């Protein structure tokens, strides 16, 4: 039922996008608002020398390919963040988790919808207080996931509104899921074709309002194939369950437990 309601909402939204709105002009969908991305410079915001920032700086130079980019510090970011001439990739922390966030700059009170700021995609990458070190190894994969999503959102409002969860519809036939992190890491490092590894990202301590993420990515192409966000009330919430393994199997994968 939830999926049907979401599909109906998106359909109505896309239909409404073409209609004029009295006193406000045209409604622009997320795809329309993102259309200028390939021609704009993406500012990579870095300040300091944390392991995450060092890894991000190194992997950006290798992996970023979908727009011009420049590095900037927090001072420059403060000056430019209200300009719709730039997109920004930032490292942010929220409720015990670290994220990579790609967002368009602009003034919040801007009347022109095409010049208003908005968040394109938010990728969880690590626990702030209990990092595993895997986030450094997978930084290139996280950047590839952000770029692949952005490319798909440029041509599909369905993807743009669904967010990273849109990956949950992809068939897994002919692929192998490694639930064991060590086995998954080895497959990732050797870029094993058809291998999928699991990544769990959770705050140091569970709580009534905290969340965790469980992610499935391909070892060779870094394609995102499952993205689940859930409440993190106890440690088991961040572990891949037997029920999730069965869901992967129903999508066609072979699961190695």
What are these regions (language model features)?
Residues 97-116:
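Aromatic/basic-lined ligand-recognition segments
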Residues 1-12:
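Bacterial N-terminal signal peptides that target proteins for export
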Residues 10-11, 21-26:
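Cleavable N-terminal signal peptides
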Residues 24-99:
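Start-of-domain marker
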Residues 24-35, 109, 115-257:
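C-terminal/domain-edge helix-coil "capping" segments
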